[in-house]
């Protein structure tokens, strides 16, 4: 699996999909002692996902997030991968490979580009683009900045990312440091769009992924009128990019 299929950053924004809440009190990520919820989907299957709307989901204390209300999304799956944790980290740092990811738009009944631009940054400054992050940077725990532009927004957003590797268990945290805007209107303030991504090797050749994302307010207005299936397909496209698994979109 090449690095192009392993970056996962846009999950922080694009998996915030209105798929309906559930009766559980909230997600259980791998950082908790309880069994993960949602549980990991089998390899080759669509990842399990759950969405909690305002005031429904309880934020896990182990995330370190504040208990502000908003939308909370969890996604969990397994994928086959013969590389190492370092290989995955290199893929995560390959920000430029996010550009051009495509998804099936149920609203427009056709394939569309999901991310129109993406690049690593020297700091929280759009005027300081740089090459993709090196492995030494990914394993240092340093603050790493990148920017990406969603096809529905058209304006770049700057994110801060930090990664850690504990015995092959990867944890990547991401949050926006610039506001999310459209047509000069601020939709989400800095720090109100956060995600944590957990990757661990279940057994040789088999990895688990658990992603958790929250936003102070759902960003649905940013995209205008879009069918629910299109949001789901965005998440599926990003998961396919990460894992290399061919997952059929919802049509």
Question: Model-found features: residue ranges?
Answer:
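Bacterial N-terminal signal peptides that target proteins for export
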Residues: 1-9
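Sec/Tat signal peptide C-region and signal peptidase I cleavage site
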Residues: 19-23
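Hydrophobic/aromatic beta-strand elements that line small-molecule binding cavities or substrate pockets
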Residues: 158-165, 194-201
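A short, solvent-exposed beta-edge/loop patch
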Residues: 195-226
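A conserved amphipathic terminal alpha-helix motif
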Residues: 223-251
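Hydrophobic ligand-binding cavity/cleft-lining segments
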Residues: 26-152
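A short acidic/glycine-rich loop-to-helix N-cap element
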Residues: 183-188, 215-234
